[in-house]
């Protein structure tokens, strides 16, 4: 399935726009186009991809036309094969064909992965690409959680590759040298967890990576490590649990502050002090997750992405492309 | 390993005290003894278990003396076999021997499970006991998460039993008839997840249980179901992730409110409105998790349990014992 990839020189990528799936996400196309416009205004070249009649006003941005759209409900594996002229598949082709330096989509995650994998190909020796999702760490660089949901079933060898790729990504994106790696388990002891975790623990000790040891669910938001490695099932459950808990508390706080004039005034007093934390925890400010292990840069943004989230994702996509993240990731597993 | 169990008549249990491991937990023995004293003051018979010289002042409560203590760091499997005169093992024996209606410990979770399993035995047909942990649901009954950490590796047949036992427990503890069952996965579709999840999904459809379908991590605190079924690895990661996220936000809020006099005043204004939520989310108010599938009632309290948490755990233990929860759970899997 994976084709041989030859990486483009970074200097060549610098001249290319970021391809943006105009039809992906709950607020597409309006929020996507607005976010792309803001990125363009900040000096980043972008090109939209989508059916002209559905995208509507492009706000002056270039549009690569196509005829199909993969919806959130479409079966990922099937849709990327049958909808070959969809905005997702065409965006991935622009990266493959050297017409874009990176792609960004807030659409169907499985189909985004499938399009990127089929069109950009897998890096040599990569068993499976994974999702590296940034988890905010107030006052520090985000923690990279990998795999955040691409592979429900994993082998120890896959998890070791996730660790290598996520470490390279952490260095490329956040400048962290020798990132500390944690393995998600249900206790700090090497003897705790599933056979998958125990075997991966042993293998990680031999990699030469900066392996910290096991970490637990409670460490996600207060992490002693820079990278958390896990299978895509556990990673996805943990990430959504964390997001759900944060959203829940924010909702409670919003309700309480909105109770009456007195509580509103109290909320206004606290707001300037809370804002730095809210900003740090805001998924829209984080810039999306990256697919690790492909022959090009693909950024997956939240389905609920706002224009701001898309602008950030575009910016991150370009930085990773011209920063040579793909070469770094390729080198990490050779 | 499991012995045949014969359940005691509920009327007999009503006359028995709750056995409390005086040496279990980060704040043992002082918080444990104080919590037991408060339960006794509320009219619940309790008996402490522990080495007299370590327990110290029992505040007038009866003490079953023993000579050993299993620490948090002790290997669970080994310690329950070698430390036969430990407070944990002796507490489980009191239940087995009809001298206590239930046991409560905030100590080493693995050793608590081991002691209870070895001494009380497994209910007939139970493949594996599991931990049923209550997750607070503000404004409603708590959601029972099973397995919250007893079995890192599970089969579909085990998960189906967890669903049955947790449903019986949910009815016994919270009075919910025909509890709605959710299966923790990474998407609502039956086709999402690991082979374990997919096969369990199929089996749950045939059980006659009130099976809702798959739920996701984000549903833990905002749940459409009364019971969430998962393997003990995923359940433990999800529970700790949720607790970590809540603790993190509470910490941020506390810091912000403590900034200066103005923010303290604002905090005082919001406090009465926040308290109901904080109370609902307070693990100390929840009363601990129950081991499901044993021949007696064993309540596992948080390692960080306060006196209040222990009082609640004792109260829950007694209620479950005299409410016939063990018979209900036994009946659920026959």
Q: What does each of the following model-derived ranges do?
A:
Chain A
Residues 23-24, 68-69, 108-111, 118, ...:
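Short glycine-rich anion-binding loops that position phosphate/pyrophosphate groups of nucleotides
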Residues 30, 47-53, 60, 152-217, ...:
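Glycine-rich phosphate/diphosphate-binding loop of Rossmann-like nucleotide-binding domains
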Residues 60-100:
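Phosphate/nucleotide-donor binding subsite
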Residues 27-32, 85-98, 102-116, 127-131, ...:
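Short glycine/serine/threonine-rich phosphate/pyrophosphate-binding segments
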Residues 29-30, 36, 42, 48-49, ...:
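A glycine-rich phosphate/pyrophosphate-binding beta-strand-loop-alpha-helix module
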Residues 117-141, 145, 224-228, 232-334:
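Glycine-rich phosphate/nucleotide-binding loop
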């Amino acid at each position: 399935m994976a084709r041989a990839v030859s990486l483009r020189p970074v200097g060549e990528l610098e001249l290319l726009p970021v391809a943006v799936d105009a039809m992906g996400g709950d607020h597409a196309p309006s929020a996507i186009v607005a976010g792309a416009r803001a990125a363009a205004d900040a000096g980043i070249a972008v090109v939209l991809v989508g059916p002209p009649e559905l995208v509507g006003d492009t706000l002056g941005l270039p549009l690569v036309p196509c005829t199909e759209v993969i919806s959130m409900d479409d079966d990922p594996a099937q849709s990327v094969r049958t909808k070959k002229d969809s905005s997702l598949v065409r965006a991935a082709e622009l990266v493959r064909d050297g017409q874009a330096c990176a792609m960004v989509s807030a659409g169907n995650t499985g189909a985004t992965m499938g399009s990127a994998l089929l069109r950009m190909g897998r890096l040599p020796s990569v068993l499976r690409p994974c999702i590296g999702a940034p988890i905010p760490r107030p006052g520090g660089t985000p923690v990279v959680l990998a795999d955040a949901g691409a592979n429900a079933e994993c082998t120890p060898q896959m998890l070791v590759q996730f660790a290598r790729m996520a470490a390279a990504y952490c260095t490329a994106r956040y400048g962290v040298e020798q990132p500390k790696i944690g393995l998600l388990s249900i206790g700090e002891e090497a003897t705790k967890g599933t056979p998958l975790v125990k075997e991966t623990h042993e293998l990680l000790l031999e990699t030469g990576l900066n392996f910290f040891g096991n970490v637990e669910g409670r460490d996600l938001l207060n992490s002693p490590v820079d990278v958390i490695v896990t299978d895509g099932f556990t990673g996805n459950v943990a990430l959504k649990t964390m997001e759900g808990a944060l959203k829940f508390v924010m909702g409670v706080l919003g309700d309480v502050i909105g109770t009456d004039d007195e509580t509103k005034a109290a909320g206004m007093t606290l707001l300037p002090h809370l804002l730095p934390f809210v900003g740090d925890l805001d998924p829209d400010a984080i810039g999306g997750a990256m697919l690790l292990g492909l022959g090009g840069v693909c950024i997956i943004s939240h389905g609920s992405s706002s224009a701001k989230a898309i602008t950030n994702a575009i910016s991150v996509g370009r930085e990773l492309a011209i920063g040579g993240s793909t070469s770094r990731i390729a080198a990490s597993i050779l």
